[in-house]
């Protein structure tokens, strides 16, 4: 300790010399040195004092005077201070050190000297361990919490999440040095203890920089980390092999492919989201969505988010996000939302045919629809599968008619039906294998068709279909999935998201409460009409996603609006809206007659809403 103290003392003297030189009126160094030497009894606390003194630049002059004129007085003052600090423990004093030193850091000379002194001091004396900057501490906590929550979120039972976890662990181990860096910046203590030399250099570098710069760098670090995480999650997601090609596909035709079957879309979107969105944010969103979108597959929400991000139209993105919020809808909803522009045209394709199909298909029961679905799958597969969800059929049929009217979409419609098609599929992928098998069968076509099918159209029909169908089979699956997700959902991450504005949107996706905002937001603009339809759609459908009935109601509402909007939005679509309305009313009456309790209620609510 003696040698350490001596070194510190020398540093201290040098530092004071520099400080006083820097300060307006340099005091005779000899006096300062003399005062320092006179204070030999306190060599140990001197280092601590020096930060205290330097911390006050203005006062430092006075101090210099004091030292020159009345060293004893200063000594007593400093002694008190040192005693106090010693009581607090040297570590504490170190923290004082650090807290106080930043202010003077504005002066170049002082900054440099201080940083060197501190560096040495840190390495030699273990004061650094307690040396936590308060400001940094909070940020550290946040970051740590984020990483933990991510870990926790991803450490869910599902194999996919497990896989993701493993990947993340691997990645984290790779990127841990970086993370530790970041934390090191926040956590001088551990830094100094564990890797003193490196941290100290890091620290000195940071200290050399202005505090703002340090923060910036820290931010950068965190961004990088999040980026790695981002990459991670998409990779993990892409680890689902089947959906990888789809991902590629989705990426190629992000809008169209968004319609890609659930898992593919999910993955692709997830991947896309990191790709398209700013990395850090997208990752957060990704995970957040993953966690937060309970009803639908989180991936779907993430996917839709990625698509949102990827998709050129901002409004659409938002709505997509919302859609993804229902991920059950999200596949459709956001799919529709993203291609909505496309969808407008497709929808125009044959509103009449859509109406026709909805008419024909709606009438049949689920079984009939399913039979039809099987028989039609090739040709009318889109519409019939939709019908296949005959119970969804009223919606699905309208939807499917829309799908079928867009022949490319028709296939999508099956996807829809199936996966509600995609969304179900997504769900089924993550949620229920049994469903998945069925939707899986159709899902490839659905995927392709979905991308083909206008997302907006998808949106409509999926929501309808989704409602009734989901209400039954999917509602259970969804319940299951939701329970699982919910477990994951309410993680610290979620809480943090609640606090930070950047996550508000994701949160909205998750919570029905918030959804009304997007629900209303889109209505104003006609270009927004697409996005707004999508948005409404997604908001209403996601909102109702959990309750298929309410979902269908809000969806129908949003659908009605979006369709109207769509018609107003695109003249080509405008014919379609009428037919759509027709098919919708038809589906309404049909679903009513069908009296599948859920379908019925959804149709009823739907019709009532529409009215």
UniProtKB/Swiss-Prot annotation:
Give me any GO biological process, just one.
cell differentiation
Keyword annotations of the record: Differentiation, mRNA processing, mRNA splicing, Nucleus, Phosphoprotein, RNA-binding
What spans are recorded as compositionally biased (Polar residues)? 270-290, 322-341
Its subcellular locations are:
Nucleus
Keyword Phosphoprotein listed:
yes
Which residues lie in Low complexity bias regions? Answer: 190-202, 291-301, 390-422, 430-461, 522-549, 565-580, 596-611
Q: What are the start and end residues of every segment in region (Disordered)?
A: 38-248, 263-611
List, as start-end ranges, the regions of compositional bias called Basic and acidic residues.
203-216, 462-482, 499-508
Q: Describe tissue expression.
A: Specifically expressed in neuronal cells (at protein level). Expressed in the cerebellum.
**GO molecular function term, any single one:** identical protein binding
Please list the residue ranges that the record marks as compositionally biased, kind Basic residues.
107-123, 131-189, 217-226, 483-498, 550-564, 581-595
Xref: Pfam families: SRRM_C
List the GO terms this entry assigns under cellular component, sorted alphabetically: nucleus
Q: How is it modified after translation?
A: Phosphorylated.
Principal place where this protein is found?
A: nucleus
Q: Which domain of life is it from?
A: Eukaryota
Q: What does this protein do?
A: Splicing factor specifically required for neural cell differentiation. Acts in conjunction with nPTB/PTBP2 by binding directly to its regulated target transcripts and promotes neural-specific exon inclusion in many genes that function in neural cell differentiation. Required to promote the inclusion of neural-specific exon 10 in nPTB/PTBP2, leading to increased expression of neural-specific nPTB/PTBP2. Also promotes the inclusion of exon 16 in DAAM1 in neuron extracts.
Similarity comment: family membership: Belongs to the nSR100 family.
Name the record gives this protein: Serine/arginine repetitive matrix protein 4
The scientific name of the source species is Homo sapiens
């Amino acid at each position: 300790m003696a040698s350490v103290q001596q070194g510190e003392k020398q540093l201290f003297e040098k530092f004071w010399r520099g400080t006083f030189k820097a300060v307006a009126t340099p005091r005779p160094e000899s006096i300062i040195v003399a005062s320092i030497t006179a204070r030999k009894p306190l060599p140990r606390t001197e280092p601590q004092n020096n930060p205290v003194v330097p911390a006050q630049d203005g006062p430092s002059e006075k101090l210099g005077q004091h030292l020159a004129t009345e060293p004893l007085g200063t000594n007593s003052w400093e002694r008190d201070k040192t005693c106090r600090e010693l009581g607090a423990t040297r570590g504490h004093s170190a923290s004082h050190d650090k807290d106080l030193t930043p202010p003077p850091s504005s002066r170049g000379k002082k900054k440099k000297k201080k940083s060197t002194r501190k560096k040495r001091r840190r390495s030699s004396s273990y004061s650094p361990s307690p040396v936590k900057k308060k400001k940094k501490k909070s940020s550290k906590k946040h970051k740590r919490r984020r990483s933990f929550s991510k870990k926790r979120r991803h450490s869910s039972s599902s194999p996919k999440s497990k896989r993701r976890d493993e990947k993340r662990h691997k990645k984290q181990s790779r990127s841990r040095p970086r993370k530790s860096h970041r934390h090191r910046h926040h956590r001088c203590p551990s830094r100094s203890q564990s890797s003193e030399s490196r941290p100290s250099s890091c620290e000195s570098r940071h200290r050399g920089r202005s505090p703002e710069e340090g923060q910036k760098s820290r931010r950068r670090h965190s961004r990088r980390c999040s980026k790695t995480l981002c990459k991670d999650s998409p990779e993990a997601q892409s680890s689902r092999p089947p959906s990888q090609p789809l991902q590629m596909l989705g990426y190629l035709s992000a809008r169209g492919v968004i319609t890609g079957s659930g898992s593919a879309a999910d993955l692709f979107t997830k991947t896309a989201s990191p790709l398209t969105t700013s990395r850090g944010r997208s990752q957060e969103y990704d995970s957040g969505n993953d966690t937060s979108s309970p009803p639908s597959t989180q991936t779907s929400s993430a996917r839709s988010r990625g698509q949102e991000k990827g998709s050129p139209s901002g409004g659409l993105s938002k709505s997509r996000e919302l859609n993804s919020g229902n991920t059950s809808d999200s596949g459709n909803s956001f799919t529709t939302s993203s291609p909505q522009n496309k969808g407008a045209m497709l929808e125009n394709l044959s509103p009449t045919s859509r109406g026709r199909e909805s008419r024909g298909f709606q009438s049949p029961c689920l079984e009939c629809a399913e039979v039809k679905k099987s028989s039609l799958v090739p040709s009318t597969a889109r519409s019939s599968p939709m019908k296949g969800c005959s119970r969804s059929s009223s919606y699905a049929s309208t939807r499917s008619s829309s799908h079928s009217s867009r022949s490319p979409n028709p296939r999508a419609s099956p996807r829809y039906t199936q996966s509600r098609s995609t969304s179900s599929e997504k769900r089924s992928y993550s949620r229920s294998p049994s469903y998945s098998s069925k939707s899986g069968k159709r899902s490839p076509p659905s995927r392709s068709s979905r991308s083909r099918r206008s997302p907006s159209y998808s949106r409509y029909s999926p929501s309808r279909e989704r409602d009734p169908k989901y209400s039954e089979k999917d509602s259970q699956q969804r319940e299951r999935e939701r329970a699982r997700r919910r477990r994951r959902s309410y993680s610290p991450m979620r809480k943090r998201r609640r606090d930070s504005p950047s996550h508000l949107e994701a949160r909205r996706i998750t919570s029905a409460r918030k959804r009304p905002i997007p629900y209303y937001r889109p209505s104003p603009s006609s270009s927004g009409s697409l996005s707004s339809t999508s948005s409404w759609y997604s908001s209403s459908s996601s909102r109702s996603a959990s309750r298929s009935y309410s979902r269908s109601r809000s969806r129908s509402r949003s659908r009605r609006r979006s369709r109207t909007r769509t018609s107003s939005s695109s003249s080509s679509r405008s014919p379609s809206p009428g037919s759509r309305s027709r098919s919708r009313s038809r589906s309404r009456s049909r679903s009513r007659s069908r009296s599948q309790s859920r379908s019925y209620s959804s149709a009823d609510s739907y019709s009532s809403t529409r009215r």
